């Protein structure tokens, strides 16, 4: 019985060894990859000087109101953790990062018309400018340094790419880029609007110009067929018209 147990233990150890070495640099296989998903903003704050950008507010005074603000995580923080061995100690093959491009500057309601909390694009899924990295995450050079660090550890980097839709049109962006006259200052647009009728500010958003205009996107209040998967919008988000074959004008703010 003792010999059988020893033999079983040896077989198990050999199997574990084979599994652990399954994804070397020469034999990498996505089917056996260990993928670690990182929401960059919520991982590690390595540089507090880049915590506030674009007129955003990060602290509204309570934990509930701050639930969807930017919390400070950035490329420097990820690089710091990588150098400490965080990912290698876990046996990670791939780090999957949320989208890194510039997000909408303002916020949208985090809970319907009640506006329980301001919801920013901290998660990377509310893109504004696909040609720039969001300053809250860091710089191009810092991003390259992070990727180089992970590559040196034999870790691949996978990026999110939300190409189906831009982020919501926000009041702060409307003011900063002169999309529309909403009757607010930039500071007022960034504050938590709850005592006013939030939706009234967007009553004319279909006429906003300089943003992603009608040739680019469809909006949910344009009465598209929401049962048609090619025309439906998700959670009221603007939807890029991927089916169009005509050339479109690059938005003025890009």
Predicted regions and their residues:
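Sec-dependent N-terminal signal peptides
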Residues: 4-14
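Residues in and immediately flanking transmembrane alpha helices
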Residues: 15-16, 173
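Substrate-binding/active-site clefts of carbohydrate-active enzymes
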Residues: 27-33, 41-254
């Amino acid at each position: 019985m003792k010999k059988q147990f020893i033999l079983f233990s040896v077989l198990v150890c050999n199997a574990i060894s084979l599994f652990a070495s399954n994804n070397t640099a020469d034999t990498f296989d996505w089917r056996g990859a260990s993928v670690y998903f990182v929401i960059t903003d919520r991982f590690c704050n390595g540089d507090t000087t880049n915590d506030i950008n674009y007129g955003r507010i990060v602290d509204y005074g309570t934990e509930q109101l701050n639930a969807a603000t930017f919390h400070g995580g950035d490329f420097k923080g990820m690089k710091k953790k990588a150098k400490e061995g965080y990912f290698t100690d876990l046996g990670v093959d791939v780090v999957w990062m949320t989208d890194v491009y510039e997000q909408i500057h303002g916020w949208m309601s985090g809970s319907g018309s009640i506006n329980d909390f301001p919801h920013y694009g901290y998660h990377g899924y509310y893109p504004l400018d696909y040609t720039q990295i969001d300053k809250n995450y860091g710089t191009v050079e810092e991003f390259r340094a992070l990727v180089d660090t992970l590559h040196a550890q034999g870790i691949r980097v996978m990026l999110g790419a939300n190409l189906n839709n831009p982020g919501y049109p926000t009041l702060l962006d409307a003011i900063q880029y002169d999309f529309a006259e909403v009757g607010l200052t930039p500071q007022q647009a960034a504050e938590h609007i709850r005592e006013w009728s939030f939706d009234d500010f967007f009553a004319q958003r279909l006429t906003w110009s300089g943003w992603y205009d009608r040739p680019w996107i469809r909006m949910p209040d344009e009465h598209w067929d929401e049962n048609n998967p090619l025309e439906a919008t998700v959670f009221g988000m603007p939807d890029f018209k991927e089916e169009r074959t005509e050339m479109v004008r690059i938005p003025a703010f890009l």
